[in-house]
Amino acid sequence: MVDVNRFKSMQITLASPSKVRSWSYGEVKKPETINYRTLKPEREGLFDEVIFGPTKDWECACGKYKRIRYKGIVCDRCGVEVTRAKVRRERMGHIELKAPVSHIWYFKGIPSRMGLTLDMSPRALEEVIYFAAYVVIDPKDTPLEPKSLLTEREYREKLQEYGHGSFVAKMGAEAIQDLLKRVDLAAEIAELKEELKSASGQKRIKAVRRLDVLDAFNKSGNKPEWMVLNILPVIPPDLRPMVQLDGGRFAASDLNDLYRRVINRNNRLARLLELNAPGIIVQNEKRMLQEAVDALIDNGRRGRPITGPGSRPLKSLSHMLKGKQGRFRQNLLGKRVDFSGRSVIAVGPTLKMYQCGVPREMAIELFKPFVMREIVAKEYAGNVKAAKRMVERGDERIWDILEEVIKEHPVLLNRAPTLHRLGIQAFEPVLIDGKALRLHPLVCEAYNADFDGDQMAIHVPLSEEAQAEARLLMLAAEHILNPKDGKPVVTPSQDMVLGNYYLTMEDAGREGEGMIFKDKDEAVMAYRNGYAHLHSRVGIAVDSMPNKPWKDNQRLKIMVTTVGKILFNDIMPEDLPYLQEPNNANLTEGTPDKYFLEPGQDIQEVIDGLEINVPFKKKNLGNIIAETFKRFRTTETSAFLDRLKDLGYYHSTLAGLTVGIADIPVIDNKAEIIDAAHHRVEEINKAFRRGLMTDDDRYVAVTTTWREAKEALEKRLIETQNPKNPIVMMMDSGARGNISNFSQLAGMRGLMAAPNGRIMELPILSNFREGLSVLEMFFSTHGARKGMTDTALKTADSGYLTRRLVDVAQDVIIREDDCGTDRGLLIRAITDGKEVTETLEERLQGRYTRKSVKHPETGEVLIGADQLITEDMARKIVDAGVEEVTIRSVFTCATRHGVCRHCYGINLATGDAVEVGEAVGTIAAQSIGEPGTQLTMRTFHTGGVASNTDITQGLPRIQEIFEARNPKGEAVITEVKGNVVEIEEDASTRTKKVYVQGKTGMGEYVVPFTARMKVEVGDEVNRGAALTEGSIQPKRLLEVRDTLSVETYLLAEVQKVYRSQGVEIGDKHVEVMVRQMLRKVRVMDPGDTDLLPGTLMDISDFTDANKDIVISGGIPATSRPVLMGITKASLETNSFLSAASFQETTRVLTDAAIRGKKDHLLGLKENVIIGKIIPAGTGMARYRNIEPQAMNEIEVIDHTEVSAEAVFTAEAE
């Protein structure tokens, strides 16, 4: 067997007849499969053991030779070689066709490769191949045109006219084969190149297409006549199996039926030819053979598909590859794996961040081989077989061994759908009773898991390397940050938030207020014994917490705090300031001075002078976690998170918050507010009846009135709420629910949307506490149902978007340290009108500068060129008043097939500089796809009457951008740089004309009357600027401006959609995707290169082709950039394996075979398909080829504080 990991590349070509014969182990002559009496394969049939190998290991068909010792002997009685039965998956046979047959992929594909090679129309080809017309092959001395078609009648007439043998005309695939053999590739190519110099329009397009195909044949060494088959390969029998079902019936693969038809027809044709049957009968049989082979290769491509029982179309060879159930996606890209299990999940509140609970029964099955090895090593059993019996019997001793085996052996947990890389994480297993897997509550957010019946899969990494990678790279405790935005993904939620909220509440006048304690223990003791309340404000000696970063003037004082906050701060990392107020100043700069008693001051006096602080909410906890991570990195953060979780659960249990109907407050003046609204609506309707407003205006006014009424109720609710009300606490802390839920419980439900999407004028006046009337209930059910269907549709849409994104960017990997480019990207804050979508500070964090940044006023250099911009540095740059900075960007990176570390910046998931080998393309795709489900499905109307276009938003807009479609509501853009000199309105055509005066001439643009203008007379506009509101068509922008402007525009547009929905995504992810859409160019003029005009190629390949020509002083080729949607870009990738496994499998393979394409296995997908280690992360050559060194050869790293991660990477490099 070939060692997959030694592959350099993989090529696909057309198979020549001699190649097919060399694969074959014998000819299949009979359509029989197996003998139904003996169940043995028939001789010379489709399952013949002589051709394909024995059905049982080391045993010939007749049973003369059995056992491995006869390996390699061919039995003299039955002719079967004694070998493994596995060869029945590898050995092929063949069928010698009695008449040539065209291959349907090359004849029927779009464009028809046969048609282009011969310069014949597909329809003409079809007539010839299926025996409806003759084609002139050699006119000899007659005036007939070569390749012209003759009907049966015309053929006879011409024969009589010119005499027999005066010209050659044939029908069927044989004729096509003769024509293909006559094609002189070199001469045709030269002729077409000449033609291209003068041709234009349709003629030129056709010439370019023919040239493309002929050139492909010429370069690849494939012969055009191989598109017609004389010999048909038969795939190995174990790939088209026959299985016996209960009851003696057989289930067989459809391919066997299709092969049987071919063999039957082929044998019948052979017999007819032997008998010298009449031509018409032979022709008919040849046509049927042609159709049988078509059905075998691609059933249903031409005419009606051949059906099996129950009129189900049979699955042909092409169907075996296509689609989700095809070979590529079902078996090569996603396999079922051993050592895996699946179970329902339950919460494990006592687990540590790096642990998960595994039921004993699952663990013993998953770790069976490890346990058996230990049993034999401890000599509890003599051999593996006995050990296996011990495990299956459930011997008492196996449980202790299991405990040993799983120690330090991480397992992987995965929850479907795996939307991003945090959907699979590693944990150390802890054995538990019961049958459910136990999951740490904090990792739920990353998995998007809850405990209402979700299931998860568990996998065991087997090899030492796999275990090391799971522990070092995938351990859940290491994944604190979300790769999409670099914010913590493990923020506490629900009970944990509620517990910490309750713990940090303050209350005036509670028992024990004003007591002073010498240290934490005394305070806790007072609280436990009922002398002080959790919320009462008390004093504590500062010097009892010597490790906190106090200011010098605070160290010897007494500080005012609450018992709860003493407990809360006790779990904080030591070097974090004492948290007294839930704000960033306290977190970053230290505890404010107002909480400290001056010597001799009365504590009650200070307490009375202080305001009551609000408790710590979910957002504040998130900020604390982010700060902890920034200062202390992973290990300390995950330990702190566990303490925070335990404290939260403990105190939410103690608080015992419950919610009942009596906790929903009643708004005293609800009736007044609603009466006033009714009154206002009546006035509006009166005005409408008098003709003072249009129906549209009335509708807007009515809906606005009810909206304002609802807001008034909401406002009243917030004003009158009691902060100790459990519902209010739940909402305010961020544990669950928000103000709109609260206002539906206590205020009014408000306006509802009708099924047509329009808002109904009749609002629902009741709230859930009062209960809804039947009519109100009926109105509100539509919204609920629409919500459910929307979610279902959105999930599918978002999943498909992620798949396309992953496909287009899967080969973008960090390939080198620095590409040395001299280009950069000038960035500023992204704005939408007056609103800031993304600030400059956010965009700068974690990027490298391209040029140094100077203070705009003092001229002082804030940061040099090619330096990493940290969070603090970004703030400093923005505070200095800098508005734009030139940074290194993925857009301008010069690395081939990937990105370099400097152009990418930090890895958001770790907060450190990105490592070489990181698969940033896949991470980018997941980061953009994963929040897709949070985007809305709706396309909004923009405010009533003002505009005549719909503006697409949410998920449809993201798809529109990434597929580079023409947007809905397109903006008119200018092609000249200059000033707007005039905007004239033309009432007759209902349009406006905008005139822009540039240096070279005047630009005149017609825009619809109703369009909102973005420019006024006198404005200065750049090329490609939008004159009206709406989305710019990116392909149009590319014609007017350069690639970088288009990339910048697309980046800003994607960010606008996501930010408007409150989803943050790092710029670099969008940059990676957009760069992939613009990596191809189309050759315009080939110059002195041997490129063909109109060819689509990678920018790097194009530059290479020009390099040699420029050096030798020739004329280089010219090209223009092409913007491709992600689906098209995936299919145009250089790897045919990746493209074929994505979509349009047959088209991709047809094209690749003709070109004799080589797949250099650079991306991830192609390596997964052939089963090779992927060239990313630890699979990169630079990590795999490391030679182990003796310790004395390695330079010792300085013994400053080096974290475990740093040591690991230093060794890896």
UniProtKB/Swiss-Prot annotation:
Protein name: DNA-directed RNA polymerase subunit beta'
Known EC number: 2.7.7.6
Statement: the UniProt record of this protein carries the keyword Magnesium: yes
Family statement: Belongs to the RNA polymerase beta' chain family.
Enzyme class: transferase
Top-level lineage group: Bacteria
Tagged with keyword Metal-binding: yes
Cofactor(s) this protein cannot do without: Mg(2+); Zn(2+)
Keyword terms, alphabetized: DNA-directed RNA polymerase, Magnesium, Metal-binding, Nucleotidyltransferase, Transcription, Transferase, Zinc
